[in-house]
């Protein structure tokens, strides 16, 4: 068994995504956008479209951080908080209020709500008791980048996890029964 992982590059996610969005490297997400619409792809790599992130994607990134990189990495990048509390009601200000927006602007880490963090903790616990997941994640590297040229096109991937014995591990999160069925089906795409 070859356990050499010298081909894996470690860099911040922001650098990886910038290099995709600038058109320097093709990624699976950009390729999917290109398949959907070459015009969309062009607008993305020329900066005509601001990258937007859904709440589900943010939650997934936070889950990946905690599950694959550990609590130290999670705490480095995220803060668990519902936001500032309205002194009149004793409840957090709504996310659409100026008070919340001002507070959010002052944060040096991404904010994860207490409810979302509880969900992420459940995901982590589920992974920790799943025998196959434990085996796959027992040895390896999280969030490594690999770059190569494919048919003359510079490509890159940011792997969730690389296990030298089992290969690439793609952690999927689901928040519904429909999502779980979809995740189960996607296993066959990768195998």
Language model: regions and residue ranges:
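Metal-dependent nuclease catalytic cores that hydrolyze phosphodiester bonds in DNA/RNA
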Residues: 1-157
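Mg2+/Mn2+-dependent nuclease catalytic core
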Residues: 137-184
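Positively charged, low-complexity/disordered segments
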Residues: 185-191
């Amino acid at each position: 068994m070859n356990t050499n992982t010298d081909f894996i590059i470690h860099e911040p996610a922001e650098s990886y995504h910038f290099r995709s969005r600038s058109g320097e490297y093709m990624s699976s997400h950009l390729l999917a956008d290109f398949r959907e619409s070459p015009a969309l792809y062009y607008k993305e790599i020329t900066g005509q479209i601001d990258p937007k992130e859904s709440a589900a994607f943010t939650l997934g990134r936070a889950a990946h951080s905690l599950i694959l990189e550990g609590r130290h990495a999670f705490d480095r990048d995220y803060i668990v908080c519902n936001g500032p509390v309205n002194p009149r009601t004793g409840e957090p200000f709504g996310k659409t209020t100026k008070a919340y927006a001002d507070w959010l602007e002052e944060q040096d880490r991404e904010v994860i709500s207490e409810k979302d963090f509880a969900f992420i903790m459940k995901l982590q616990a589920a992974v920790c008791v799943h025998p196959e997941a434990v085996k796959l994640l027992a040895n390896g590297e999280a969030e490594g980048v690999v770059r190569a040229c494919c048919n003359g096109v510079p490509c890159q991937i940011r792997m969730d996890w690389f296990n030298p014995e089992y290969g690439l591990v793609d952690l999927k999160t689901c928040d519904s029964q429909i999502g779980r069925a979809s995740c189960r089906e996607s296993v066959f795409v990768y195998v």
